[in-house]
Amino acid sequence: MEPNRIEVERTDGGVAVIALTGEHDLYTAPAISDRINGVLEDGTALVIDLTQSTFIDSSVLRVLLEGRREAHERVVGFAVALGEDGFPGVRRMLEVTGLIGVFPVLPARKDALRQAASGDGGS
């Protein structure tokens, strides 16, 4: 099993990617929030990459919602990459909570990068 990781990468296209690997919950949510806030404070568009995340709970969903709201207020792009064959539990959590309609959730990281670079973070 992959260890839980939170990695921040800045792309040449001016978009930051926060990639979550493994399981994320109440214990990792504050660290995810800190990284999201750090990126958005710079006015940088953001992609949350969940393609390698096997589990997220409601505390992580709250952090994602707060990040999307902050991106919207700063008028910077925000998108989520779920992966073509994303982990079913993560996809289901986003579907059940209705968050797939709240911010852009795209099947591939490259699509999420393009969406975030366009400045659109969902309404």
Give residue ranges: language-model regions.
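STAS-like cytosolic regulatory interaction modules
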Residues: 1-52, 66-123
